């Protein structure tokens, strides 16, 4: 949510920020609405003062035995006018909130300007794309040949964009998630959390999924939402609260199922596990002081990179451009991993600094050592990493010509010492 005071202070900058997102200028209409809203509030305060003065005058008159019928009639008329003005003020408040809540976060000045992913900037690359001495197969070809990746069975159970994993591949995916959680909680200073997979409207609103992106979510018949990422419940743990500055930064991590409708992905990645309705992901969330959020963003991104480095996967860090940065983010780094079977770089992690955008939506604050509210914290989130995509990358990177798959050394303790997966 945007701070209306910032809009009042510099409407030109506000419109320029919207322009970078490819959106039309809105400052003038928002300021006109804001002026009407503030005028209604001022008039309402004047009416309240008049009502209080009348009540005092009526009370004094009655104590003195004076006829107060005229004053009482005036008070009744004033009450009716106040009710109409209160309704008008509430309507203007709701209209302003509705307009502001649909506008995306302001991008950092350093974010590259561009219309789509073609304008993203590669910041660094670690490792070279592996070149196998045989024709590399894609993960679904490997998994189906092993009899451990059952797409037809999943389609019978649930429809398209689901998978059933079996045997050693199911264990390998579990090992990846456990390894990531252990790494983040024991070496990276994150507190492991278990969170609900169902959230209410207010929670989905706080992180920016609602009201704009309902088509991307699954909703239950009782009106709750399946989480698209653990970012949603983790970040909202500070909603409607004031946290102590001494407790910041709050670093949390969780491994959850994630659910996405993939409404805008028709025809894309229809084979395999790359784009599914249900998948596992390890998420990292940080709540921090504004002055520390840049350092936390770099730290969080490095935590995700460490996962890929320890798995021996080639990756690159990409700075998302203005047209590719998500609704709630002020800046985002994507990590893309090399998939030998696809001969392509594919996103495996996205790490975002949302500044105070989400915290304002969820009414989060922090207090200093003196007990006074010091300000609005910054929120950050990042994949640490997508477990299914890590499984894909491991399968394609560590495949052998006979279709077997070597298990990366860091995962073998989670696999009972198994070194190779074969039919």
UniProtKB/Swiss-Prot annotation:
Its EC number is 6.1.1.11. Transmembrane segments: none annotated. Keywords: Aminoacyl-tRNA synthetase, ATP-binding, Cytoplasm, Ligase, Nucleotide-binding, Protein biosynthesis. Homodimer. The tRNA molecule binds across the dimer. GO terms for molecular function: ATP binding; serine-tRNA ligase activity. Pfam families: Seryl_tRNA_N, tRNA-synt_2b. The lineage of its organism: Bacteria, Pseudomonadati, Pseudomonadota, Alphaproteobacteria, Acetobacterales. Its main location: cytoplasm. The keyword Ion transport does not apply. Consists of two distinct domains, a catalytic core and a N-terminal extension that is involved in tRNA binding. It comes from Granulibacter bethesdensis (strain ATCC BAA-1260 / CGDNIH1). It is an enzyme of class 6 (ligase). Catalyzes the attachment of serine to tRNA(Ser). Is also able to aminoacylate tRNA(Sec) with serine, to form the misacylated tRNA L-seryl-tRNA(Sec), which will be further converted into selenocysteinyl-tRNA(Sec). L-serine binds at residues 229-231, 283, 383. It is found in: Cytoplasm. InterPro entries: aa-tRNA-synt_IIb, aa-tRNA-synth_II, aa-tRNA-synth_II/BPL/LPL, Ser-tRNA-ligase_type_1, Ser-tRNA-synth_1_N, SerRS_1_N_sf, SerRS_core, tRNA-bd_arm. This is Serine--tRNA ligase. ATP binds at residues 260-262, 347-350. Belongs to the class-II aminoacyl-tRNA synthetase family. Type-1 seryl-tRNA synthetase subfamily. Pathway: Aminoacyl-tRNA biosynthesis; selenocysteinyl-tRNA(Sec) biosynthesis; L-seryl-tRNA(Sec) from L-serine and tRNA(Sec): step 1/1. It catalyses: tRNA(Ser) + L-serine + ATP = L-seryl-tRNA(Ser) + AMP + diphosphate + H(+); tRNA(Sec) + L-serine + ATP = L-seryl-tRNA(Sec) + AMP + diphosphate + H(+).
């Amino acid at each position: 949510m945007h701070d209306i005071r910032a809009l009042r202070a510099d409407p030109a900058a506000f419109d320029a920020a919207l322009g970078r997102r490819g959106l039309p200028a809105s400052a003038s209409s928002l300021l006109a609405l804001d002026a009407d809203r503030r005028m209604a509030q001022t008039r309402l305060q004047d009416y309240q003062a008049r009502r209080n003065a009348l009540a005092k005058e009526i009370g004094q008159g009655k104590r003195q035995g004076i006829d107060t019928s005229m004053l009482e009639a005036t008070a009744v008329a004033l009450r009716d006018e106040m009710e109409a003005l209160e309704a008008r003020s509430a309507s203007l408040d709701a209209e302003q909130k509705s307009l502001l809540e649909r506008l995306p976060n302001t991008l950092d000045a350093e974010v590259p300007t561009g219309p789509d992913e073609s304008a993203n900037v590669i910041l660094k690359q670690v490792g070279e794309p592996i070149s196998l001495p045989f024709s590399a197969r894609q993960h679904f070809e490997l998994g189906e040949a092993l009899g451990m990746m059952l797409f037809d069975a999943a389609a019978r159970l649930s429809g398209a964009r689901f998978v059933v994993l079996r045997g050693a591949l199911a264990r390998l995916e579990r090992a990846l998630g456990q390894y990531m959680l252990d790494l983040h909680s024991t070496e990276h200073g994150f507190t492991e959390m278990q969170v609900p997979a169902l959230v209410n409207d207010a929670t989905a609103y706080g992180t920016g999924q609602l009201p704009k992106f309902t088509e991307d979510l699954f909703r239950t018949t009782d009106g709750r939402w399946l989480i698209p990422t653990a970012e949603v419940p983790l970040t909202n743990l500070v909603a409607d609260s004031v946290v102590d500055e001494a407790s910041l930064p709050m670093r949390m991590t969780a491994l959850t199922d994630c659910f996405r409708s993939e409404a805008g992905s028709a025809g894309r990645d229809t084979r395999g596990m790359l784009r599914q309705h249900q998948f596992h992901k390890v998420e990292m969330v940080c709540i921090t002081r504004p002055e520390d959020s840049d350092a936390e963003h770099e730290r969080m991104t490095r935590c995700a990179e460490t996962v890929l480095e320890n798995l021996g996967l080639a990756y690159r860090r990409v700075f998302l451009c203005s047209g590719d940065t998500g609704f709630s983010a002020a800046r985002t780094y994507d990590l893309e991993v090399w998939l030998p079977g696809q001969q392509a770089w594919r996103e495996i992690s996205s790490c975002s600094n949302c500044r105070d955008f989400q915290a304002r939506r969820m009414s989060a604050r922090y207090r200093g050592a003196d007990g006074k509210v010091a300000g609005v914290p910054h929120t950050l989130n990042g994949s640490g990493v997508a477990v299914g995509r890590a499984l894909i990358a491991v399968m394609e990177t560590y495949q052998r010509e006979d279709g077997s798959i070597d298990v990366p050394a860091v995962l073998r303790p989670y696999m009972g010492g198994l070194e190779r997966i074969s039919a």
